[in-house]
């Protein structure tokens, strides 16, 4: 990356941080991924807005990163600038509403809700991502989704205007929102909850997290559920019924605890995971005629 660009980015990121040739495996739950040319961590909302405006003006490619919990990044890494939102994590409570920035983790928001005796967000307490990423993909668990609790979302559009989208305008559906079609960036969101009882909320969070521990391979790096649920089926059951439970390619393996997860057993490469995804898709299509679509996002130079 040209020195002049780095100097300009440093000028913009007075509170933030800048890393050159930063290995993405340090920033993804899969623990896989080569270097980002530049990793920028804006220190505030204004720094994020100014940074994005500059990158767009100079036509420098960029990629927005939350917690990296739903990503498979290639060993060749990501060209341009990876913008990590980890410092944008302010959360405030107004009555029964929580207003949270995009980089706030779902578990932290769930704990804020608990402390303020607000119910409705328990389902998200064990999802290991950030609010921004969860909204973009309408993340969900245990029968609830972001669309059930998100009242409105503030985004930065492609012309660097700030827009507020209602729940309806987000066009939420299963693992989908309108943001997947746009070059818009989540800044913050309003989460609408209900008054509840501290002990009951805590009990529900503990029960859901216990279920998660029992059923999911949390001891290994992964990116959560590998595939979206096909209509009328469960991806994990199809994979298991296809005889692929425990099947591995290199260091990538179909979890024996839950076949819907691909895990990194220690030294998996990008292509180990990619080849395993494609092999699972092929076998499930041949045996059951069902097309499995990846839920994880695949990024970087192939």
From Swiss-Prot:
One GO cellular component term noted in the UniProt record for this chain: cytosol
GO biological process: cell division; cell wall organization; peptidoglycan biosynthetic process; regulation of cell shape
A family per Pfam: FAD_binding_4
UniProt enzyme class: oxidoreductase
Pathway(s) annotated for this protein in UniProt: Cell wall biogenesis; peptidoglycan biosynthesis
Keyword annotations of the record: Cell cycle, Cell division, Cell shape, Cell wall biogenesis/degradation, Cytoplasm, FAD, Flavoprotein, NADP, Oxidoreductase, Peptidoglycan synthesis
UniProt domain FAD-binding PCMH-type: residue ranges: 31-196
Catalytic activity of the protein: UDP-N-acetyl-alpha-D-muramate + NADP(+) = UDP-N-acetyl-3-O-(1-carboxyvinyl)-alpha-D-glucosamine + NADPH + H(+)
Cofactor: FAD
Gene3D superfamilies membership: 3.30.465.10, UDP-N-acetylenolpyruvoylglucosamine reductase, C-terminal domain, Uridine Diphospho-n-acetylenolpyruvylglucosamine Reductase, domain 2
Origin superkingdom: Bacteria
EC number(s) given by UniProt: 1.3.1.98
Active site per UniProt: 175, 225, 295
GO MF term list: FAD binding; UDP-N-acetylmuramate dehydrogenase activity
Subcellular location: Cytoplasm
Function per UniProt: Cell wall formation.
Family: Belongs to the MurB family.
Protein name: UDP-N-acetylenolpyruvoylglucosamine reductase
Source organism of the structure: Caldanaerobacter subterraneus subsp. tengcongensis (strain DSM 15242 / JCM 11007 / NBRC 100824 / MB4)
